Amino acid sequence: KAGNYDPKTTIVIDPRLVFSTFTGSTQDNWGYTATPAPDGSFYAGGIAFGSGYPTSPGAFQTTFGGGVNEDNNGPFDMAIIKFSANGSNRLFATYLGGTSNEQPHSMICDAQGNLIVAGRSTSPNYPRTIPQVGIGGGYDIVVTKLSADGRTLLGSVKMGGINDDGVNIRGKYVAPDGADGTRRNYGDDARSEVILDGANNIYLASCTQSNNFPVTAGAIQSTFGGGNTGISHFPQDGVIIKFAPNLSGVLFSTYFGGSGDDACFVLSLNPVTGNLYVGGGTNSTNLPGDKFGALHDIYQGGLTEGFLTQIR
């Protein structure tokens, strides 16, 4: 965030490099997300394509869970590592996954340094602390809370409908008809964000291709909006979910989308009102919500547009 500056001058952003390091993995390893902890330590999350990730003794999962070949990639598990504030020490490292494939999308820490990881999984035995939410199928959304020392699963949920959830239109497939528009809008298929409120409730913005994704009573939008059918995917809506702090249950869950493809990418809470702001991409001309007085109250054209919505 830039401070006060003269808009007539050139801004030079020259941050100081605190540390840069390899993970030490002897297996292929690809990074997706990272977050700081309250004490200045640092978490990084990615995927590892087999045994050889440098897990630490006593970590929650020290062995590779397994997986399948997917689009000429795989198998892969989530791979989570925590570094000291100066990057000189590995505080812990762990796999996170079941017998199929997993991928992290977003991470955040609570005030105690516990780590919340949001992503997706196709494993029927993904580590969780409550039963599957929804019937599941394809990729499901997963949210997991690990203790600050990486040893204990404090809470974990797997949630989804019959088709892919948490997948923003698989990136391998570029549709000539433009049906991959929301993927292009943000650059890849691994898009969702997790945040916390002051009571440590967990909020997630993501997407679903399931017309039976689990929603809660009184949801803003209880039915699937629809979308485009592309080379590799079903129609897609955004989803917005709130979980209990220990992931013991879903406090609310709703679709958010019109008759085109929609995806929720980012979210933020107003610290004064508690209202939730959600941003994403859409090619729906009938995106839900009261647009009276909005900067643009109708779809402006093009393959995909961004959107911002406020939920009270």
Named regions from a protein language model:
Residues 5-312:
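A sequence-level/structural motif corresponding to short, flexible coil/turn segments enriched
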Residues 1-3:
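A generic structural motif
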